[in-house]
């Protein structure tokens, strides 16, 4: 067993996960679902947001060692102060996806490549990000 890395001060675990209104993120170009979904935001704990001067719907620059995105914030008590959350599957680059094109930001732009030694899957909780008001 190896001790996992921990975020340094000013860094946060980048978490991602599924959202209820989409099926495996293959339905994000569906106009009806798009109409009724909330816009993609990065969840930021209230205490962190206060320190950084961020309020809900402010644009936030999210930076990792491999990339950077800008998206709106959702300030909430519903996440730990050492974590941020982005719904994956957004930030499509294909202009053929006329509804989903350029909607939100892609978490893939931020994730570092870590392979879980047991399952061979990508270890998605070992990417750390920094936040600043954009």
What is the predicted role of each segment?
Residues 1-32:
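Long, low-complexity segments enriched in small/aliphatic residues
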Residues 27-43, 47-134:
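Long, contiguous, secondary-structure-rich segments that constitute the structural scaffold
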């Amino acid at each position: 067993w190896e001790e996992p890395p921990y975020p340094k001060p000013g860094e946060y675990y980048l978490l991602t996960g599924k959202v209820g209104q989409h099926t495996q993120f293959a339905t994000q170009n569906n106009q009806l679902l798009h109409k009724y979904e909330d816009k993609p935001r990065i969840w930021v704990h209230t205490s962190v947001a206060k320190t950084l001067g961020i309020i809900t719907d402010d644009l936030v620059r999210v930076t990792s060692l491999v990339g950077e995105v800008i998206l709106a914030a959702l300030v909430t008590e519903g996440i730990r102060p050492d974590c941020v959350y982005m719904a994956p599957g957004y930030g499509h680059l294909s202009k053929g996806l006329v509804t989903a094109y350029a909607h939100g930001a892609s978490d893939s732009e931020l994730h570092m490549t870590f392979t879980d030694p047991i399952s061979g899957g990508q270890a998605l909780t070992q990417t750390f990000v920094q936040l600043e008001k954009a």
